[in-house]
Amino acid sequence: FPAFNSPDLKSQCFFENAGGSYASKQVIDKLMQFYTHHKVQPYSPFPAAEKAGIAMDKSLELISGMLNVASSTIHFGPSTSQNSYTLAQALRESNPSKRTIIVTNQDHEANTGVWRRLEKSGFVIREWRVNPETGALSTDDLNTLLDDTVNLVAFPHCSNIVAYENPVVEICR
């Protein structure tokens, strides 16, 4: 992380969110390569575009291998906030019998706001509340919120609000 060599950041701890995180040298190098050699529409029939497409395909293969999922299930977008907004807009047209979304109060507005705003489109928003003593989410509490009308449960893997890592596998069962 080259930024931490600068005098303003040297010897500092940085606990910012993903949108404000500093990039590693490897990411900076790849971005520099992209901006200087392949900043074109990928997959077009000329060398720079072909190389851009190959680089995108390689990144999908690497990520799919890390996550142990098919590369066809991975989609890149400009930011988590924009991706969530796009997904929320698509959900607006979803099955009318599945109009309930569960969000937590363990998250911040950037993660729950897109879902909460769907209430204006007729969705029911249920809040899965943390234990006020521990900051943890209880799967027992979640089970009381679940029914056949639930379309989505949105929760953080790690909450930077209460410094808690949620048991994702247990929650998703």
Model-assigned labels for residue ranges:
Residues F1-R173:
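Pyridoxal 5′-phosphate
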